[in-house]
Curated annotation (Swiss-Prot):
GO terms for cellular component: cytoplasm. Pfam families: Arginosuc_syn_C, Arginosuc_synth. This is Argininosuccinate synthase. It comes from Rhizorhabdus wittichii (strain DSM 6014 / CCUG 31198 / JCM 15750 / NBRC 105917 / EY 4224 / RW1). The gene is argG. Homotetramer. GO terms for biological process: argininosuccinate metabolic process; L-arginine biosynthetic process; urea cycle. One of its GO terms (molecular function) is ATP binding. It catalyses: L-citrulline + L-aspartate + ATP = 2-(N(omega)-L-arginino)succinate + AMP + diphosphate + H(+).
Length: 405
């Protein structure tokens, strides 16, 4: 193992990656460079720097990069253009962060002359695949160290024992126990493990960290507007905002109204089912708003094709194929569809619910003249429907005659 001289570790400062840092130093006897991505997780960052220093990493080998704008602009918004929902529900908050972390990790590895990269994903989960597909897609010959697939620490309890033995501070949640397995960024917060591993048990209220209980949300609804240009949000209530600023503002609105909670049993790429609790307050609002503006700006054929492609697109992201040619091909088609997806959506937020209550666009395909139940002044000749129906019924009539119906 001595052939590894320097490794770049994706480091959150949590239990797993703190143990991994010490384990790499001991097992590989190499220099460890830590990289912490600021994706909007907030207070997690400075403790990560302090912990890395405490464990012997010099300042010049501690990287904490603010990637919030890049994350939303180049990853979240493109994904949202595709209306991606994994298994019809999950807004992919963890999945979409991994390719950016992997990309920056490889950039740092090249800059510091590292021999390898390392991550804290377990051998049971999706993240090991997502990270490593990103690494290999960007640096085909990079060496990857995945401690969970190498060491004999087979449980969280074993990790805690290792941490205590080596005087590594172990984070505690507000109930005085070791924390859930969590992931946080500007798009979402996820929690897994402990009581959540029983799919029959209701998620305890203390697990939710990002949204108020919908029952305790304001008793009055709040009306907002989101402006879109070419498929991307650009303004909230008429105020222009950068991508990260917009999502941050929507997160606060969603938090206040208890929006974006999801209790999901999902199918992992590696084959097993897992249960996760997700909070995506701003993303839930944004997703519905984007669907709302598409309703009046996309042609039926384009809209239906997008709906057919969306599950495949979401699956590619979930499984870690962000840098694959097929994801890029789908992205090109999706982005082309967004050329006229410009306008304003009005939404109502109330006790965990978000509802589109208005939409307008200079490129609208909605014609009140044509669709009205009142006199349309010749905008639509209803007699034309007879021929349309006869042509579409032809094959059904032929089948019926043949089969004696």
């Amino acid at each position: 193992m001595s052939d590894v001289k320097r490794v770049v570790l994706a480091f959150s400062g949590g239990l797993d990656t703190s143990v991994i840092l010490k384990w790499l130093q001991q097992t590989y006897q190499c220099e460890v460079v830590t990289f912490t991505a600021d994706l909007g997780q907030g207070e997690e960052l400075e403790p990560a720097r302090a912990k890395a220093k405490l464990m012997g990493v010099p300042d010049e080998h501690i990287f904490i990069d603010d990637l919030r704008e890049e994350f939303v602009k180049d990853y979240v918004f493109p994904m949202m253009r595709g209306n991606a929902l994994y298994e019809g529900l999950y807004l992919l908050g963890t999945s979409i962060a991994r390719p950016l972390i992997a990309k920056r990790q490889i950039e740092i590895a090249r800059a510091v002359g590292a021999d390898a990269v390392s991550h804290g994903a377990t051998g049971k989960g999706n993240d090991q695949v997502r990270f490593e597909l990103g690494y290999y897609g960007l640096a085909p010959d990079i060496r990857v160290i995945a401690p969970w697939r190498e060491w004999d620490l087979t449980s969280r309890t074993a990790l805690i024992d290792f941490a205590e033995k080596h005087q590594i501070p172990v984070p505690k949640d507000k109930r005085g126990e070791s924390p859930f397995s969590t992931d946080a960024n500007l798009l979402h917060t996820s929690s897994e493990g402990k009581v959540l591993e029983d799919p029959w048990e209701e998620v305890p209220d203390y697990v939710y960290s990002r949204t108020v209980n919908p029952e305790d949300a304001p008793d009055q609804p709040e009306i907002i507007t989101i402006d879109f240009e070419r498929g991307d949000g650009v303004a909230l209530n008429g105020e222009g905002m950068s991508p990260a600023t917009l999502l941050t503002a929507l997160n606060e609105l969603g938090r206040k109204h208890g929006i974006g909670r999801l209790d999901l049993v999902e199918n992992r790429f590696v084959g097993m089912k897992s249960r996760g609790m997700y909070e995506t307050p701003g993303g839930a609002i944004y997703h519905l708003a984007h669907r709302g503006i598409e309703q009046i700006t996309l042609d039926r054929g384009a809209a239906h094709l997008k709906d057919e492609l969306a599950p495949r697109y979401a699956e590619l992201i979930y499984n870690g194929f962000w840098f694959s040619p097929e994801r890029e091909m789908l992205q090109a088609a999706i982005d082309h569809s967004q050329e006229k997806v410009t306008g304003t959506v009005r939404l109502k937020l109330y006790k965990g619910g978000v509802h589109v209550i208005g939409r307008k666009s200079p490129y609208t395909l909605y014609s009140e003249k044509v669709v009205t139940f009142e006199d349309d002044a010749g905008a639509y000749d209803q007699r034309d429907a007879a021929g349309f129906i006869k042509l579409n019924a032809l094959r059904l009539r032929l089948l019926g005659r043949r089969d004696g119906r």
